[in-house]
Regions:
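Amphipathic alpha-helical binding modules
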Residues: 99-102, 118-127
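Short proline/glycine-enriched turn/loop segments at secondary-structure junctions
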Residues: 56-57, 114-121
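Generic short beta-strand segments
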Residues: 48-52, 70, 111, 131
Length: 135
């Protein structure tokens, strides 16, 4: 199910006709934002910061994951769209991590992310916090 959710996200974000429409109407594109230093166009995403619990009787060990997912544009309604998008994005997040009997992954923090075309401009984040764990 998680693999299918991730593949569905990729299909949506890479749909050429959808991207053409969004480009025409908003001047921006849907994107899976690279976690590297360069993004070549204005884009919006969701960064999922996570960690792991190595054993149930152990303290939580925080390991940072940065898995961004693209959204088409950022405006006053972006928060609502972020929340609509989160369910699928979180499923895809867990699809990347192997869940064993003694290891459980969690999402510690969720942040909308705006990346501008100007390399001098860093990303802005708006605090949207969520803790999601699988036990």
């Amino acid at each position: 199910m998680y693999k299918e959710a991730y593949e569905l996200i990729r299909e949506i974000l890479e749909d050429e006709k959808l991207n053409e429409f969004i480009q025409r109407t908003t001047g921006k594109r849907l994107a899976i934002i690279d976690s590297g230093p360069k993004v070549t166009f204005p884009a919006v995403g969701i960064m999922l910061h996570g960690g792991e619990i190595s054993r149930p009787d152990n303290n939580m060990q925080e390991v940072q994951y940065n898995i961004p997912f693209g959204l088409p544009y950022f405006d006053a309604n972006a928060m609502a769209r972020c929340h609509e998008f989160l369910d699928v994005a979180i499923e895809a997040f867990f699809a990347h991590e192997r869940l064993t009997e003694w290891r459980r992954n969690f999402v510690k923090r969720v942040e909308p992310l705006l990346v501008e075309d100007d390399p001098e401009e860093k990303c802005w984040t708006v605090a949207v916090r969520a803790t999601i764990a699988i036990f």
